[in-house]
Amino acid sequence: MKRVFSIKGIPVIAAVALLMLTACGIDAPVDDPDNQEPDDKEEVRTGIQSFTNPADGRVITPSGETITCVVFTDAAYAAELVIHSGESDWAKLNKGATGEKGRNNIRIVFEENETEEERKAELMLEVDGYERTSLAVFTQNPSGKTAAMEQNMHLNGYMHDILLEDYLWADEYAKLEVDLTIDYTRFLDTYLMSMGDVNIEDGGLYRANSANPGQRFIYSNIQELTGTKAIETGGLGFGPIFASQITESGLMGLSIAYVHQGSPAYAAGMKRGDTIFKVDGVTLTSSNYQSYMTQLYYSPSGTYTFDFVRDADLETAYTAEVTAGSYIYNPVLYSAVLTEGAHKIGYLVLENFDLNCQEFITDIVDQLASNAITDLILDLRFNPGGAVAQSRYLTSAIAGTAHLDDTFVKVTFRDGKTQDWKFRGGPNDQDGLGIAPDLGLDRLYVIGSYGTASASELVINSLKGIDFPVYIYGGRTEGKNVGMTTTQTSYKGRTYLFSPITFRVANAKGFGDYPDGFPADVVVNNQNDSYADDKDNLFPYSFGDWGSMGFNVALRYAYEDIIGVSHSNAPATRSASFEPIPFGHTGLKQPQQGRFGNIIYLPASQR
């Protein structure tokens, strides 16, 4: 990352939109002819160092799509797309038909398949001085009603059967007349939303400060699993981004909510609050910024050059080149300790509760314990939930060994059966994660928002159930007091995960009535449709990094309460910031569960 030029006298205006960035990259074998001894396998020498195909392991969608492959070669090359079936122009090379030595993008456009026949095309490539080789075979499914109907009937039928048995409102659902042939991606919204207020706890209404105020949404969902190792993810490494107009002349910026540790963007030096105003040399304006947001969201691979400003300092701009790729997912977005007098304040920002990443959580809890923290600020503003077991593990470290035999959560299923989880572990005092070290705390400071839900809210409610003081800063939490079991089904080699709402949760006192969320004790953003009455109208987002209390207003208020000074509504002038603590994680075990933004319980077969 380097500084490139200055922008002077530019006022900052409000945030207006957000979008998740995801992408994936797949490593390919390296074939280095310079390091191979001559043998009988000379024919495998291709001159291709690596090849990344974002469509590897799946079929091309019948509606058509555009993919960008990345190839590294030892010399110039020529590529050809060979059509094996279907009309001659249904798949075309849009970019990269020829290229020089090194890295090149090969873009392929697949048209919609309006026939009832499967189509195949093969990407061939010949590097100068090497033999012609096949890089990939692409298969596109037919769009005929029969194939689509079979898939919909399988997946909808699978969901329908489970909803009839285990859905928390199964009796009311059973009264519906459902069409199993509709698009399976619309099945849940179509029928579960039609139930009205009966199942309002399965979702709710978007809040006034959202993009869809007052509209209904549901939690129950089905999603296709795209890989076998959920711990390994791909892309640029950005979390959500929000768009803001940064000049009166219409210059737009895409501000990053956070950057995953160990990701390509993290390695390139980018961080939370960086505001991108150019992508590959193109200035973002009100007429093109949305297309770039979409491009970054859907691009599974590729290299981007970003020009951006940092910490709302519009006098200096930076540039970074980021190449999408695979990396180990880490739900710990930031961890730090700040010593202030007699206080050693731990600050932990956690994106979700993911059993695949338990070793990260174990490691950071161990480090907080070894640092002998006296106070903890747990930032859950972007944490939509996840595994009950991991939420239990972290909360037990906060509550301490004195509460190991107290109830963490009571789970009640549709049939009336209940299970009682202790802070020690559960059900039956055993969830496989063990007992966390006692952090020696007597209270907890939580930063929450409308993005704090499910297993994150279990932390708050379970501690309230044992009269352990919890103070919330930021905004009202989501209010998801129901959870789901997860099951899988396969269809023609593709795996789908279904997560319907199947149980309610309550704490040791029997309290679970928080469908409107937990209110903040110190409100930073009241989440209404006006920015004028907010102490921080960007919250939960920011133009600064996690540890900068000048931008992280909720963090500053919690810090001020801990050290016993009054709050200031003016921007902080304090120069000290939280500094990250070293991360000591060295290894990972085989993944156990997927990563999901809900309260996730064991499937029925594992209970």
Where are the model-predicted features located?
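Extended, small/polar residue-biased N-terminal targeting/export presequences
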Residues: 150-253, 301-303, 309-334, 596-601
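A short beta-strand micro-motif common to beta-rich folds, especially ectodomain repeats
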Residues: 106, 116-129
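Solvent-exposed, low-complexity, repeat-rich "mucin-like" stalks and linkers
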Residues: 42-83
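Surface-exposed binding patches on compact interaction domains or structured appendages
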Residues: 47, 74-107
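PDZ/PDZ-like domain segments forming the peptide/carboxylate-binding groove
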Residues: 231-278, 282-285, 354-360
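C-terminal, low-ordered peptide segments at domain boundaries
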Residues: 277-373
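Bacterial Sec-dependent N-terminal signal peptides
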Residues: 2-4, 13-53, 129-153
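C-terminal "post-core" interaction segments
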Residues: 343, 347-348, 358-363, 367-375, ...
